[in-house]
Each structure stands twice: as structure tokens, then as C-alpha cells.
Amino acid sequence: MGDRVILHSDINCCYASIEHLHHPELAGKPLAVGGDPEARHGIVLTADYIAKKYGVQTGMALWQAKQVCPDITFVSPRMDLYLRFSRMAHEIYAEYTDKQEPYGIDECWLDVTGSSSLKGDGLLIAQEISKRMKSELGITVSVGVSFNKIFAKLGSDYKKPDAITTMYKSEFKQKAWALPVSDLLYVGRSTNQKLAKFGIRTIGDLARADEGMLNSHLGKMGSILWSFANGYDESPVKLENTHAPIKSVGNSTTTPKDLVCDEDVKIVLYILAESVAARLRENGFRCRVVEISVRDNELFSFTRQKKIDHATNITGEIAAYAYQIFKENYNWSKPIRSIGVRGADLVTDNYWEQIDLFSSVEKREKQMKMDSAVDEIRRRFGFYSIQRGLMYRDRILSAVNAKEEHTVHPHGYFG
């Protein structure tokens, strides 16, 4: 069997590039998306390449960005607009393969192994996608072409903007091994610091390191990263549309900034619970188990679940259970990088269960009616037409429509 052909497409400075299309008067001028420009608070979600040359970085406070780039223009995020462009990009991708795995709004893996006989080899497909993104959407992409997902993403990061980089088996040692180990997917700041203590500064250093030593200091992440560096990633690109029976419904997200307190977590859990509950209702299911997954900023992760009293697809109930599970199981030893909510042990809407005389049937019926009304308002007028008051406490964390974006980040590497 021959090598797989995997692409990773990354929309360059996604939010900023789309805003430039809608603000032609800002052509050639530095621009950043994020926060509340009028109130001058919040952080930079993305900056264009002009602003980056001045030192503006994602996650930087707006006031800091203004200091390093006095002429910068800030615009508030418009997630509905960015999601529309993301969907249009995926429509282009779908003409080459149905094996698409989104990684956020702006990135996507494509398995085009079965498309080469009709569309040409991976490099040709990447060139065609790049050309079409420019001509049809007005934005540029960087595309990595490789035999696995890890090196395909490394290829898309290798050169920006508007570039195509191959990372074939015959060349990845020459191209990848000289790069800083921090360029490898899932090597965060803390892991990078640990590796540096052992003299591991490049991907090549990591590939040549003793796997047992890495395991002793990093746990199973040591073996995972060692295999990535050596090109042994065999993780599949997941089909975009799967018609297998639904056994659970979940969403997870890597947040735009680390979560550092209970309030941060509550906001994100409610966003994810809204998505899970809405998708349960759409498919005619309720869940009898609520599960959360948490990963800290050192990539240590855990999963906990709770059997609940009544099968539910009520947003508030799922969110409350998720938050209760979190409070009972996390001690805030480290900030949180990503979090997920899942409804499992599903039953259909017509499932009959014993009514507890002490439970508030009337209250639950009101909550169900409220959820149905919210579903209808959002269907007619858009996701952001109605929001919970909680979401206004942090507009950066609450700026994600988890249901529509449906960017369940790939956690399969971590079990």
C-alpha cells in the first residue's frame, strides 16, 4: 500500500484577511481583530501581516498592540461572517474529498489519497485549492502536503502567507528536523521548556532522543511526540459526514486564551452545553450521562462523567451538571487550555421514565419551551441574535458559536 496523501490548509490571518475584504479603505494598513475597540479592552484574536511586522501578536492586550503599532486599526470580531467564509472554503475542499477534519475555523486536514487518479497528485490539488481560494473567496491559504497529519500541518506552518510546502517521506528529515521543537503540534511552552532541559531544541533532537527517557519525564506524551517527530503519525482524517448511529453528542474547544478561574470555565461550559443540547434536540435525543473533558496548559487531560437524574436535552441542566462535575474534580493547579462537554447514554425523545414527585415538572417544561424558542429565534435571525447574560461577561471567550462552527478539535492522540 502506498503512502497516504494528506493536506493541511490554513487560511492566512483568517479574521483579519476577511475584514480587509470588507474594509478596502484599510488596504496596506495594519489591522487586528479582537476585543472591544471602543472600550480599548480585550485581546488580539488575529492580526494581519503588516501589524505582525510591528510585533503585534495573537493574545496581546489591545493597549499593548497600540503601543507597538500606533497606526493599527482594531475591529470587533464578526464570527458569523468568518463562519460563512469557513463554510465556503469547506465547499471548495469537498470537491476534492469528503475526508475533511476541521481544526478551528481557519484550518482543515484533507485526505486526498483517493482523489489523485481524478484530480492529480497532492501538490497539484494543493495548487488548485490555493488558486481557487484566491479567485473565489479573495483570501490566501498556506497548504502543507505530506503523508500524515502532523507533517501536513507542519508544512502549512513552514512558509506563510500564500505558500505550499511538501513534507514527503524522502524529505521530512531535511525540512522538519532543523525546525524548533516548539513548531511541532502539541509542543506548548511548558513542554518546550521541559525538553530544553534535556538539550532537545529541534524536532530532530526529539526524533533522535531516547523514547524511554521521554516517557519517564513526559508520560505518554513523550512517546506521542517522539513518534510525531519520526513521522509515525497514522491518525486518520475523519469523514466530515458520518452516517453511523449517534451514540453521543459532544463539542470541545481550544479557547482563545487560557482559562484561569471558575467564571471563565462557566462561560465556556455554557457555550458548549448550548451546542450539545441543541444538537440533541435536533436529532430527537436526550442524554442520561453528562461528561466533561479538560486539558491544562501542559496538555495533561482528564475525563469525568456523571449519571444524571432525568434524561435531558435542556441547555441549563446539561451546563449545570457539567459545571458541577468540573467543580468536584479540578483544583486549579494549572490554567486550562481546552475543555469539552458530551451527552452520552442517549435515549429518544419518546423515552418514558418514572417521574419524581419532588422534581419540578413545571420548571423543566418552562425550560424546554425556552430552549425551543431560542432555537427558533436563532434559526431565523442567526446565532448571535439572542445570548445569555453570562456571555457578556467576557466577549472574547463567548465569541464562538460552537454548534455552527462545529470545530471539535482532534483529541484522539490523547486517549
Segments (PLM) and residue ranges:
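Short, hydrophobic beta-strand segments
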Residues: C108-G114, T303-K306, E353-S359
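A glycine-rich phosphate-binding loop feature that marks nucleotide/adenosyl-phosphate handling sites
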Residues: F147-I150, N230-G231, R286-N297, I336-V347, ...
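Short, charged/polar surface micro-motifs in flexible loops or helix N-caps
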Residues: C14, P37-R40, N297-F300, L346-D349
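C-terminal hydrophobic structural anchor segments
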Residues: Y323-R380
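DNA-contacting surface of Y-family translesion DNA polymerases
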Residues: H8, D183, T191-I336
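Gly/Gly-Pro- and Ser/Thr-rich, intrinsically disordered tail segments characteristic of DNA damage-repair
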Residues: M1-S227, V237-E240, A278, R364-G415
